[in-house]
Amino acid sequence: MLEYLIVGQLINTHGVKGELKATSQTDDPQRFKKLKWVYIDKNGSLEKYDINGVKFFKQFIIIKFQGVDSIEEAEKLKGFYIKVDRANAVKLPENSFFISDIIGLKVYDENNQLLGELKDVIQTGSNDVYVVRDSDSKEILIPALKSVVKEVSIEEGKISVILPKGLLD
């Protein structure tokens, strides 16, 4: 499991006083209002930044970090990812997982046959869809429904599914 989770990306400056515009990579952008600090991933080097203010503008989050007081300073942070440590991550309901924790798990069918590796999760609104790549690099799209996904074991690196009839046809 990753120690830090991506919650957003700094995409541009906002104004001239050091604010930054960010996109959310979390289900609940309002969580930014509860954060007191975050980590900025500067190409693999994490730096802690205290948050002085958060507001929302259209689909974006406007963040003011302590010590970033000019457009020039803000410009240096553009493009970097915003991360939180697990202690500050949202508490998930039982049998729910962070996408970053399940990417890379092996996916097996009801006969314990390897289908492939989970490469991505598409969030459709109604239910997630797992993108599984098999040994021939073919993608299988599997609905992440309780009736399909029977077990997720991060410890074993495994997801067990019962495929709907006709899914592989």
Swiss-Prot record:
GO MF entries: ribosome binding
Domain of life assignment: Bacteria
Annotated ranges, domain PRC barrel: 93-167
Coiled coil: none
Entry's localization field: Cytoplasm
GO cellular component, one term: cytoplasm
GO biological process: ribosomal small subunit biogenesis; rRNA processing
Main location: cytoplasm
Record Gene3D superfamilies: PRC-barrel domain, RimM
Protein task: An accessory protein needed during the final step in the assembly of 30S ribosomal subunit, possibly for assembly of the head region. Essential for efficient processing of 16S rRNA. May be needed both before and after RbfA during the maturation of 16S rRNA. It has affinity for free ribosomal 30S subunits but not for 70S ribosomes.
Family membership noted in the UniProt record: Belongs to the RimM family.
PANTHER family noted in UniProt: RIBOSOME MATURATION FACTOR RIMM
HAMAP family per UniProt: Ribosome_mat_RimM (MF_00014)
Complexes and interactors: Binds ribosomal protein uS19.
Domain notes per entry: The PRC barrel domain binds ribosomal protein uS19.
Protein name as it appears in the record: Ribosome maturation factor RimM
Organism: Ruminiclostridium cellulolyticum (strain ATCC 35319 / DSM 5812 / JCM 6584 / H10)
Upper lineage: Bacteria, Bacillati, Bacillota, Clostridia, Eubacteriales
Gene encoding the protein: rimM
